[in-house]
Amino acid sequence: MAAARHSTLDFMLGAKADGETILKGLQSIFQEQGMAESVHTWQDHGYLATYTNKNGSFANLRIYPHGLVLLDLQSYDGDAQGKEEIDSILNKVEERMKELSQDSTGRVKRLPPIVRGGAIDRYWPTADGRLVEYDIDEVVYDEDSPYQNIKILHSKQFGNILILSGDVNLAESDLAYTRAIMGSGKEDYTGKDVLILGGGDGGILCEIVKLKPKMVTMVEIDQMVIDGCKKYMRKTCGDVLDNLKGDCYQVLIEDCIPVLKRYAKEGREFDYVINDLTAVPISTSPEEDSTWEFLRLILDLSMKVLKQDGKYFTQGNCVNLTEALSLYEEQLGRLYCPVEFSKEIVCVPSYLELWVFYTVWKKAKP
């Protein structure tokens, strides 16, 4: 599958740019490649030169008067000869700019090329909006369920990564996530009743079952997540997803809201409730309102099925999203019962950003 390879080269000159001199100095590099030239000029805004090749590759050279010079080149990623030509152009432009600027170049920045439209999507944003290129080399699983798109991609560093509707959820390398959302090794699960909301990758269930609980109930709405993970995420889930019932656990393929309401009505209580459903929304925009309402409902229902001395564990979001985390903490003060909370910041390998986890418990009755 042919893809577009987008390369960039930036110069920040130490003085104002003589656009005409730079343009004339670089023209021969593109002409040597047989590229046709089109130049636009603005009296106070510099130059834009566009160079096109017969093979479809092209380059944009933008020269700003204040000293910023930008070069963008695009070619077919599958064209080995075209790649060599682009690399040659970049090298020659960098050398020529050093000559033209007479060593007044304050900064040169050459980023790795971005490959767009490839068979394997290697680019995923962090929660706070930064672009990350993963070392993805294989699409292991890609299916649409009635609820979401499910991808499992293989990373050379992180192993298989579960991605749900564009959000990086968990990689085989991410035991740190599972440990954090279970209390970071500080809890004794022996003989305890545990409720997991979500958790379709099986990581939490797999780790808790090892700790000899009385019973673990996991409520996951999406059977296809379980099916994909039990086949391709076995380093995370082991064999616990092979059967929906075991000696000390059961997996319910249901929406957790009706289940929580049913348990609350029955008066059923748990020592631990672990919410692995979704991260804290990043804003209070109208598009996010339904997610905030969902989180508030989950919190209230979870407190109703949590024992007085029990604990509720959940993820927050990226540590940089301070406003979103503060809004979540405000919600904790609006529950039907008074609660206290603590938080922990953990490095989850595949997230490539620090992540916040919460522990919530009911205030002691006077």
Swiss-Prot record:
This is Spermine synthase. It comes from Homo sapiens. It is linked to Intellectual developmental disorder, X-linked, syndromic, Snyder-Robinson type: An X-linked intellectual disability syndrome characterized by a collection of clinical features including facial asymmetry, marfanoid habitus, hypertonia, osteoporosis and unsteady gait. Spermidine binds at Y177, D201, Y351, E353. Catalyzes the production of spermine from spermidine and decarboxylated S-adenosylmethionine (dcSAM). Disulfide bonds: none annotated. The modification N-acetylalanine is found at A2. The keyword Iron does not apply. It catalyses: S-adenosyl 3-(methylsulfanyl)propylamine + spermidine = spermine + S-methyl-5'-thioadenosine + H(+). S-adenosyl 3-(methylsulfanyl)propylamine binds at Q148, E220, D255, C256. Changing G67E: In MRXSSR; a reduced spermine/spermidine ratio is observed in patient lymphoblastoid cells consistent with impaired spermine biosynthesis. The modification Phosphoserine is found at S57. The active site is at D276.
